[in-house]
Amino acid sequence: MMAYHSNSRWSGALVSGALGVCAIVAIIRPAHADPRAVVELFTSQGCSSCPPADKILGELAKDPSVIALSMPIDYWDYLGWKDTLADARFSARQKAYSHMRGDRDVYTPQVIVNGSVRLIGSDRAGIEGAIGDTKKTDGVMSVPVSMTLAGKQISVSVAASSTASTEAHGEVWICSISKTVPISIGRGENSGRQVTYYNVVRNLLKIGDWNGSSGNWTIPLESISREGVDAAVVYVQDGNRDKPGAMLGAAYTSLH
């Protein structure tokens, strides 16, 4: 499937500063310590080619060295089934990647590995090959990221990069995640099927800018909480939301 679509607004939020809360500080132990890859899957409940890719993403999510994210898009909603997990921001993100590459390859299922390598989402061998080709000496996934929980706040720490240039610029984002979401699809190409989606991004908030130096940010837990959210991901990405580049670091953790 292939589609071209209009830009969408992103609802980023910058939240920082001490809130004066007295609480026991507990380190959130990342389930994915020192990950080597962030794998984004652009998928749709209305795409008959997507279920195999959704299954592969679920299998990749079990790998502690991989942060796998499902980003359901909305541009197939006109085909007869409105995707119940879709977000126009994910459609805009996929299109932004295509603009950065200089092509118009916007389709489902599509995987982006570490912000730079695009593949068909059902090409498991290709995805695993791209993950294996990651070289931290090039700066990709080389920045340590950690999260701590203090009462009703999440604190994010990003270490300084040893490879970033003096002109480095990127952004720090936090994602709300639902680990598994089974969906019964009533119409469209997947009518009558039940498909389970893994590590579904339910919200996406910008929390800061990055220039290669270490940084710390504090986010109210309620800003990413909603029904069904049971994990969080923080990632540092070169460029910005309209011109996304390489993934520089990330962390994933369960919230419950």
What are these regions (language model features)?
Residues 2-18:
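Bacterial N-terminal signal peptides that target proteins for export
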Residues 10, 14, 26, 51-54:
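Extracellular/secretory pathway and lumenal proteins
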Residues 21, 46-49, 174:
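The N-terminal extracellular segments of secreted preproproteins, especially immediately downstream
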Residues 21-30:
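C-terminal segment of classical bacterial N-terminal signal peptides
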Residues 31-107:
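Active-site-proximal cofactor/substrate-binding loop regions of enzyme domains
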Residues 82-104, 116-256:
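Short, conserved sequence motifs used for protein processing/export or organelle targeting and
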